Amino acid sequence: MAYFAEGKQNVRKIKFYGGTDMKMKTITSAAALILAAVMLAGCGGNTGNAGTAAAPDETTNASNTAGISTEADEDAIKSMTSLEMIRAMGNGINLGNTLEAYNHGGYLNGMNPDGFETGWGQPYTTPEMIQGMKDAGFDTIRIPVAWTNGMHFEEGDYTIDERLMSRVETVVNYALDADMYVIVNDHWDGGWWGMFGSEEQETRDKALEMYKSMWTQIGERFKGYSYKLIFESANEELGDRLNDKEVTGSKGVLNKDQCYETANMINSEFVKLIRSLGGNNADRFLLIAGYNTDITHTCDDRFKMPEDTADSKLLLSVHYYTPWDYCATESVNHWGSPKNYEEQNGLFEKLSKFSQQGYGVVIGEYAVMTKHGVKPDTDKFYSNLLDNCDLYDYCPVLWDCNDFYKRATNTTADETIAEIFLSRRYENEKGKDVEAIKSEAKERIEETAQNASEQQKESIEFPPSDDMAIAWIMFASNDYGISYSVGDVYDPTNCTTGVKAGNVQITGEGTYTVSLDFTDCGSAKGTAFSALGISNGEILFPGYTYTIEEILIDGEVYEMAGKSYTSSDDGKCTRVNLYNGWVNEVPPEARTADGDLTDCSAQIMTLPKKRSVDTISITFTAKAPD
């Protein structure tokens, strides 16, 4: 398994599993014609890259000319705009958990940083692995790096060890020799970024000094390299994690506004520094990390793209793991409801504010991660994501840690996903009209969302209606990963994909049973909120009381912690709280069949937070008022 330590939205990641497909873009303008001609010429045997990459056991510096493409090729890339570059970058993959595998402590104890890349379970990178990724349909590779793996920064020495620098350069050369676009960054790197949030000005100054020194060395080393090499200002650290405490020992003091200001400052310093180094860095494409690399936070007006002396050479980086419970946990196994599509389509449309301003956008990480093979509906998730990338000019870069692409054998883990990658490689789309690609993508997005809506409607036994009283279980797991129609408005479409509900129509007095089955989407962990709801209950059956007779959890009788009562918050929906932590006192208007509110509680089903729940069944009695 691949181990690392990095947070996502304040969630500590320990393992990354993944696999997915990506989509290509098409170059327009005269630059496209030039590049196409160069590519055709390259088929005649010209590798397009001068120099030979270092062997895996080499620690000496690679040739200064390694990775440089032909002059015509470079001129074509140099002439591209940001959006044209994104289309040329096509479909990408991360070399995950490899050169960012953190072992700074080992370096301080005298270990050779050249060997750290296997520390998180990945094999030592070879040219064959990288070429295999290219052959699998990936045109871009992102190489995360932990540069302090070769640095004594605690002593104020920010010199990057030559052995680490040389190893990174060797892997970059592998990728350039495979005719791939290459992204290099500083990736988590032990959390040193938290120095920017220190209450001590001296520590903050050291952080900026180290950042500048790091990128000066990287920039100088690669200043003559191909324009296919892209520098990325950070990973996910420019945002809330500027207050991380791994290195400083205490949480930072920056408030939200100050975090935005500091992130903007770092990005600005990054651009100015790289441009000042000259060579190809004067107009190299630079990838600017968004705030937390989160779409919503990056679209906040407080985030600013930096100014640049080069024309249309800035790209924006964000990551996409939404919904987190499906993408990164085992609690949710399905994706594809109308609300899932609405959420994904809405966020990608929101992000288009940057492409509309002329900035190419890189989805620097995305994946559906699982411990056991490929999750159900992964193909739906990826296909729709890639269609959005085509529609809005984004370059998607799969997060992969030897999960989809098996580096040791140069094979892929799933034929269906592999075919999606291959079918969308740049080679298959480079001759198509850009607007035609966008139009086709939009049609697929709309058709897919419509089909999902129709399929869901067909599966609902009792759709909402003002003429019926429908009983159902409102439910949200403790981690909110699994839910079903929470709130006083009965909405059977508002649920985690895969939840099966056994709802009933109330027709008068009698005993009824409602249920929820989570087994097809995972297991719920405890409950943050749950209640029995009866839509239109107060209108169609005014004054009725509903008494919980029995609760079954996974088929076993659950001993209730109190007595149930009937109430309503809106005068329309009747509710019987099962677990409502926001209600500590029984409301005076509450009612029971026997008229006695003694021992009544809004928390009669108090499940442990981590208890796994597969099924819930509630049997209750409806009684008319006397």
Regions of interest found by a model, annotated:
Residues C43-A54:
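Bacterial lipoprotein signal-peptidase II cleavage site
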Residues Y124-A146, L347-F354, N388, C395:
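Catalytic domains of carbohydrate-active enzymes, especially glycoside hydrolases
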Residues V38-G42:
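C-terminal motif of bacterial Sec signal peptides marking the signal peptidase cleavage site
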Residues D205-V332, F348-M369, L391-Y394:
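Active-site region of glycoside hydrolase catalytic domains
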Residues W120-I141, M151, G156-W188, W192-S233, ...:
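An active-site-proximal structural segment forming one wall of the substrate-binding cleft
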Residues G373-S465:
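Aromatic-rich peripheral "rim/lid" segments of glycoside hydrolase catalytic domains that contact
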Residues V514-G543, T592-Q603, V613:
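Extracellular beta-strand ligand-recognition surfaces/modules
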Residues E58-T140:
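N-terminal carbohydrate-binding accessory modules
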